[in-house]
Amino acid sequence: VLAGECELEDVIVAGPAGLLVVPAASGVAGMADLPPSAYGGLINAFGQLSGELDVLLVDTAAGVSEGVMSFARAAQEVLVVVCDEPASMADAYALIKLLSRQHGVSRFRVLANMVRRSRDGRELFAKLLAVCDQYLDVVLEFAGVVPFDDYLRKAVQRRQPLLEAFPRSPAAFALRQLAEQVERWPRACGASGHLEFFFERMLQAIPAAAGGTA
């Protein structure tokens, strides 16, 4: 798509309930961490969908690569997903620290993933909150938990969405709750639409990213 060899609609996979998925660039070197010079092509590609999407959800990799940072600082909402592992907590803190100190992002939502009990998710959030309160000037909001659930693994094996394969599973219930939360999050203002807001922020990120590498 970025090379102009096909249109975005040629690679989109249609999912249930109007969900559209743009598959990740598995095994393609350089696609997971696009340089700022490629943002224009990305924006043009997604511009084809500007009249069709209610929500644009970007699932980035873990860590603080330039690609991750570019998408995160352009997003209206940053949802940090953490699990109870030292590497996950370190990645989450590093992302929050860089976005807050270098790009002025001051509010983050935190989702605890693969926890055994809701209380464990709250405790995980409290640990991250304590560190951020001590060293950073940011606001963290608890977005909930997604429990460890064997049904999720089974859904992956079946190559089916969890909410279709096992709609009554604990993880499916948690994801439904999260989706209902997202619907209540405030909408972007100052742009003619949700995608336009995101694209404006992406364009603003180009000189910032270029300046950081000079």
Label each region the model flagged.
Residues 156-175:
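C-terminal boundary of histidine-terminating zinc-finger modules
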Residues 170-188:
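Extended, charge-rich low-complexity interaction segments
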Residues 191-214:
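A short, charged, Gly/Pro-tolerant segment at domain boundaries
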